[in-house]
Amino acid sequence: MQIDSHLHMLLGISTEEELSVLSRIIASPSGFYREFKISKKSGGARTISSPYPSLAIIQSNILNNLFLPFESNSSAYAYVKGKNAIDHARIHVNGRELLKLDIKDFFPSISRQMVFEALQRNGAKADVCFYTSLICTLNNGLPQGACTSPALSNLVFSPIDVRLTGLANFFGLKYSRYADDLAFSGEFIPRDLASLVGEILLEYDFHLNHKKTRRQLRVFSFHQTCFFLDFVI
């Protein structure tokens, strides 16, 4: 297996033994993850795919060496330094109406090709896009448990955030996203807004989880932010 010096630095590969491990990771990535389930707050179980140290180190190198120049869309509030769930909720305080939507199977829906194209769109070289998309995906999706998955999800979703922000602006609404949770608020939310959002998501191979769609009519204040947080996310 031959990779250039730039990739050696990006991946933190410096020895033949490490290069051999990388070859095995690319050939059979599932063998480098430990899977277990955790209970969801809403019921059911979530599968966590935790990389073994040999893969986790390479993914950590990618995260530290590749993603620092990339910025998430301003409407993204999860996995962004200096932002948190309270900031996400604060955007929507004082909104008379609020619509909360959930993206179904968010991380698993982000395919290797989506990762490749997102990196390419942000100026990464073809070989970087190729190897990163291989190393950071599992079963053609982002593994929940890999340190690179959050940053990649924001990178992939950035063009959609732009579309959804434009849709919100058209109706005079505010929009923000916390991971797979989308929130729209304002004086009046059109009845077909959820359908319009769903149509945009479908263009990018994402789907709404309609069971989690929630609409609220209420005037919020800043002092209610913590209570409101439970509703938004």
What is the meaning of each model-derived region?
Residues 1-12, 83, 120-131:
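An N-terminal domain-start capping segment
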Residues 36-59, 77-81, 100, 134-153:
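Short, conserved non-catalytic motifs in the polymerase core
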Residues 230-233:
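Conserved, surface-exposed functional patches that form binding/active-site neighborhoods
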Residues 91-179, 183-228:
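Conserved polymerase palm-domain catalytic core
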Residues 31-33, 84-85, 166-171:
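Short amphipathic beta-strand starts and helix->beta connectors
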Residues 10-19, 65-66, 70-73, 104, ...:
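N-terminal low-complexity, intrinsically disordered segments
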Residues 55-101, 105:
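Active-site-proximal segment of RNA-dependent polymerases
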